[in-house]
């Protein structure tokens, strides 16, 4: 996918692009005082966090479930959304990006995350403000993985063997759950339109790199 930004470069006078990265994985927690101190240090262009990991194994992808407790995820989101809403500048509010919703990045986990963010916007900012702030969701689940991946070569990311996706064991399976790991481009496209972007399975650095690359 090629993407050419139509947004003018936002910083004619160069200054450091400032990112507040809250924690290693959404739901793992971070001190609210540290977050507030970081937000107060100067201009903030982006608040971002990744929520995914392959470390827990394939169970959570297969069951479309999260390996982090929802109450812990919502706690982290509350601090981030509140920081976004209360930002006093200079400049516009920062963008807010979350990658690999629920850890596995399936579409239902993106929907859960979006519902919680909308609820937080309403609770923290009221109906009028919450309705004025759109949220973009970028999904990554493949509903026809056999057709999408047919006769392509699988390249392993580690010591596992690769394979030819034309094999019979990759034929359509009603129980199969496959997500494609996105890079920067779909996140950049969403950031052209909105401040808050919630993603399915994403390459960890993409959630941090998309906005500075978009701005040039």
Q: Where are the predicted features?
A:
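Glycine-rich anion/phosphate-binding loop at the beta-strand->alpha-helix junction
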Residues: 180-216
């Amino acid at each position: 996918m090629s993407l050419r930004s139509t947004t003018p470069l936002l910083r004619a006078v160069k200054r450091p692009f400032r990112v507040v990265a809250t924690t290693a994985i959404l739901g793992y927690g971070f001190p609210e005082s540290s977050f507030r101190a970081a937000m107060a240090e100067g201009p903030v262009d982006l608040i971002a966090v990744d929520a995914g990991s392959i470390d827990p194994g394939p169970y959570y992808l297969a069951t479309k479930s999260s390996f982090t407790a929802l109450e812990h995820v919502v706690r982290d989101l509350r601090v981030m959304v509140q920081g976004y809403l209360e930002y006093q500048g200079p400049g516009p509010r920062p963008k807010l990006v979350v990658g690999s919703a629920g850890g596995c990045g399936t579409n239902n986990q993106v929907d859960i995350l979006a519902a919680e963010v909308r609820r937080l916007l309403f609770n923290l900012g009221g109906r009028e403000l919450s309705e004025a702030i759109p949220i973009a969701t970028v999904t990554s689940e493949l509903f026809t993985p056999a057709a999408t991946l047919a006769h392509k070569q699988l390249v392993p990311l580690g010591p596992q063997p690769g394979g030819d996706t034309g094999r019979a064991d990759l034929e359509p399976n009603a129980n199969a759950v496959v997500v494609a790991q996105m890079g920067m481009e779909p996140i950049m496209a969403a950031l052209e339109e909105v401040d808050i972007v919630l993603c399915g399975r994403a390459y960890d650095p993409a959630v941090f790199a998309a906005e500075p690359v978009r701005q040039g």
